[in-house]
């Protein structure tokens, strides 16, 4: 049970980091295209 909770926490943290990076990258592309 503890292992499951730890895995869920790890996946959640990884997902949040991945989402933050994915959301931060796209804005850089349109900015370059606008210029």
Curated annotation (Swiss-Prot):
Its main location: plastid. The chain crosses the membrane at residues 3-23. One of its GO terms (cellular component) is photosystem II reaction center. It is found in: Plastid, Chloroplast thylakoid membrane. Keywords: Chloroplast, Membrane, Photosynthesis, Photosystem II, Plastid, Thylakoid, Transmembrane, Transmembrane helix. One of its GO terms (biological process) is photosynthesis. It comes from the Eukaryota. It is a single-pass membrane protein. The keyword Transmembrane applies. PSII is composed of 1 copy each of membrane proteins PsbA, PsbB, PsbC, PsbD, PsbE, PsbF, PsbH, PsbI, PsbJ, PsbK, PsbL, PsbM, PsbT, PsbY, PsbZ, Psb30/Ycf12, at least 3 peripheral proteins of the oxygen-evolving complex and a large number of cofactors. It forms dimeric complexes. Belongs to the PsbT family. PANTHER family: PHOTOSYSTEM II REACTION CENTER PROTEIN T, PTHR36411. Found at the monomer-monomer interface of the photosystem II (PS II) dimer, plays a role in assembly and dimerization of PSII. PSII is a light-driven water plastoquinone oxidoreductase, using light energy to abstract electrons from H(2)O, generating a proton gradient subsequently used for ATP formation. This is Photosystem II reaction center protein T. The gene is psbT.
């Amino acid at each position: 049970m503890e292992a499951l909770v730890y895995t869920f926490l790890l996946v959640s943290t990884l997902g949040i980091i991945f989402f933050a990076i994915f959301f931060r990258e796209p804005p850089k592309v349109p900015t370059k295209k606008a210029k």
